[in-house]
Amino acid sequence: MAIERITDNKFELVSKYEPAGDQGEAIAELVDNIENGEKAQILRGATGTGKTYTMSQVIARTGKPTLVMAHNKTLAGQLYSEFKEFFPNNAVEYFVSYYDYYQPEAYVPSSDTYIEKDSSVNDEIDKLRHSATSSLLERNDVIVVASVSCIYGLGSPKEYQDSVVSLRPGQEISRDQLLNDLVGIQFERNDIDFQRGCFRVRGDVVEVFPASRDEHAFRVEFFGDEIDRIREIEVLTGQVLGEVDHLAIFPATHFMTNDDRMEESIAKIEAELEEQLKVFRSEGKLLEAQRLEQRTNYDIEMLREMGYCNGVENYSRHMDGREEGEPPYTLLDFFPDDFMIMIDESHMTMGQVKGMYNGDRARKEMLCNYGFRLPSALDNRPLKREEFESHVHQIVYVSATPGDYEMEQTDTIVEQIIRPTGLLDPVVEVRPMMGQIDDLVGEIHKRAEKNERVFVTTLTKKMSEDLTAYFKEMGIKVKYMHSDIKTLERTEIIRDLRLGVFDVLVGINLLREGIDVPEVSLVAILDADKEGFLRNERGLIQTIGRAARNSEGHVILYSDMAKALDENDPVDKEILDSGYYTEYEGQKYKITRSMKHAMDETARRREIQMAYNEEHGITPQTIKKEIRDLIAITKKTDSGEIEEVDASAMTKKERKALVKKLEKEMQQAASALDFEGAAQLRDMVLELRAMD
């Protein structure tokens, strides 16, 4: 039975802050553009200007159901927590991949190795995914924070909605009919272990535990063949929390199909199987034909008997009634037509949207070619970028450095440059590569005397290692962060840098999440003139931004200045006319286009910020950020003090006990919706296990 979506709920933004700096102008401009029907626009906001708050204000003022996309689970978790705080009275949902571990099905012909799909599902995230889809079908005041997994196939929203079991007191329905209906939407009867997606029966009472809940269930009490009343109960204690007038029970799986559609689907699968077997046999591929026939017939038998089989998603084209090549249903299809999309860190996220389809296609083609899957499995896939675009009603790309794709989509750019703290973008200067290390040593000593920290970025692992060794010889307290360092160690390194255990951090990519240190007053970029990843315009602006959280922020770009430009030389004259040069000690030197654009953009922002501060009498203050002991494994002593534990010095038994304790904390963090904390605890557990 279909349910009607409530359409008159309003977003209610709860915040102790009012828009500050240029947030008010940015909010007004974004809202005006949306109300005037602008399809796409960019919010180009400098680091630390409060873009999430601006996004929240826009959602509240436009009142549209909104999908907020991020490029990884960590960032999505941070955004989800922030939006939950801003909108405590609305439906803020979280939709990311529910796999803690995922090994996709694959075949490697060179070694004749078939790798079966293997995965472990995070029950908490599965609950949140169900909560997201049910909220979208029940109400209009919904914000879903999602990773790129929202463009993967999810099952038909119409089938999902049509399968909802709707119950009201006084409704005529027999108890046995309700039990049949619940089994039909993939609920399991379990009178002993009562958990999500289950129901239990006690005489004339049926208790149902929805897939979107984790603590509360519903008790349906019958009088004959009529529902007497429906109560909400606490699962653990059985305590009655109140009576409800209407209960909508959504399916326990997103992949729903009715009996008639199932028979049609099986007929189509059998027809496709026959067709493909003919192809294989005509090509002399008898092994592939035998393999495909055996595997597919087993799946068909399971579908007939159970309505489900392992890898059922590979038959989703037939189940959904789609034509070959048609895009799958995704989370985007659960939204109403006039919804809004906001893409956070769009320069990263849109690249992922583009890349998902190709990687998936290559793996599946191998499975189809060797008889592990029917060709229709190719239609169980993520959306192509152009298919994603076809779902867009109105979209806001949010980034400090929008990508080429976003810039091609729209000319409407809304800027947010002023930080509420008054902090300015750092001063950027170019210095010669010749003698750069000795020059840098002098700068490091100046910062160390003022108890400030330094980031140094290099191009290669070897250079980082050599530089770190040299700095150590010079008596500088330094550490090197490379890609092999695990999450646990990485966060410990950042904490030690902030505490002053060492003064300089050397690395190649210092743009990862969590590398956010207000104590850093100098960022030195070596080989800044070597174009490429992290030395292009966006990479340079993002790296320069690492010094924007300190009032003394300063950035030095070291570049090749072996030869000064001569305006009498035709080639040099061309460079001078193009503007791609810098002045140093009275001479002009060539710099890259990326360096020039990054420096000009930083200088432009700094000028606007300084003018604003002067007009409003604001003095920039370095951000005061608490140094949390996020990663160091700790335990409370009897006196209540926290004592650090050196895991490497523990016995195997002690480590086992610690793993147990951390797993418990991880579950608690996940239940409290602190997904970033839970992820860090998970990484600790994995690393502790690796020690044994």
UniProtKB/Swiss-Prot annotation:
SMART domains, per the entry: DEXDc, HELICc
A Pfam short name: ResIII
Keyword terms: ATP-binding, Cytoplasm, DNA damage, DNA excision, DNA repair, Excision nuclease, Nucleotide-binding, SOS response
Residue span(s) of domain Helicase ATP-binding: 32-418
The UniProt record lists the keyword Calcium: no
Helicase C-terminal domain ranges (all copies): 436-631
Entry's Gene Ontology cellular component terms: cytoplasm; excinuclease repair complex
An example Gene Ontology molecular-function term: ATP hydrolysis activity
Localization: Cytoplasm
GO BP annotation list: nucleotide-excision repair; SOS response
Subunit text: Forms a heterotetramer with UvrA during the search for lesions. Interacts with UvrC in an incision complex.
Family: Belongs to the UvrB family.
Protein's job: The UvrABC repair system catalyzes the recognition and processing of DNA lesions. A damage recognition complex composed of 2 UvrA and 2 UvrB subunits scans DNA for abnormalities. Upon binding of the UvrA(2)B(2) complex to a putative damaged site, the DNA wraps around one UvrB monomer. DNA wrap is dependent on ATP binding by UvrB and probably causes local melting of the DNA helix, facilitating insertion of UvrB beta-hairpin between the DNA strands. Then UvrB probes one DNA strand for the presence of a lesion.
HAMAP family associated with the record: UvrB (MF_00204)
Protein name: UvrABC system protein B
